[in-house]
Amino acid sequence: VYPAGERERLLRITGAADIKDCSQLLLDTACAWKRGTAEQKEALAKRYIALLSHLWEQGWAEGSSLGTTHHLGYAMRGLYPSVLLMRTVLESAGLMKKAADMLAWFSGRGRIFRREVRWESMDTLNTLLQGILYSILLEKDTGKQAAYLHTLRKWLNGILRPAPGLKGPFKVDGSAFHHAGHYPAYAMGGFQGLTPVIYALSGTEFQIDAEAFETVRKSLFMMRIYCNRYDWPVSMSARHP
């Protein structure tokens, strides 16, 4: 955390790169690798591993304390799908476990083991949930993978029931809470992060239960009522519609 008014000067002195830019570059490289020719793939794989290895060397690895002062979900969300796309390259290089452990750490996968949880931040659904799922899918031990998926299902069933008090993400009336109030702008991101995970788990023994699904469904359809193109009171839109 840079002192107020000193950020630009210190960045010039240190030559620091933003982790968000690095994360996006990893994803762009992985997408290009997926579509590339054999020759292009070889070069792109080397670039991907070089950048990821540099991040590890700088401390962006399992066990790091770099993310304890603030939420890193928005800055690092390009990382998670990039590792999934590059899994064969990482496996061949003997780096798969280190990459998977990195995903589990920075996505905060440990949260799914908390018991009797009835709420979760909308930010988690938006920026971390898919990373949690990817880290589980990269688990090579199928027994552990199944156990993690069952735990993920149980956790989702808890947090996707109507949340108590001013907690999020969803309420019994279909409103979507963040920052202790109804906040549609954050809800949109929450749905974008959550619904692909619900879809990925559907039709399997790990799919969410009917009550959790109905809570999400009701909140999504409620948007048709409270969204308005021209007139959104602050009480319905929080800081911005």
Describe these PLM feature segments.
Residues 1-241:
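Aromatic-lined, polymer-binding surfaces characteristic
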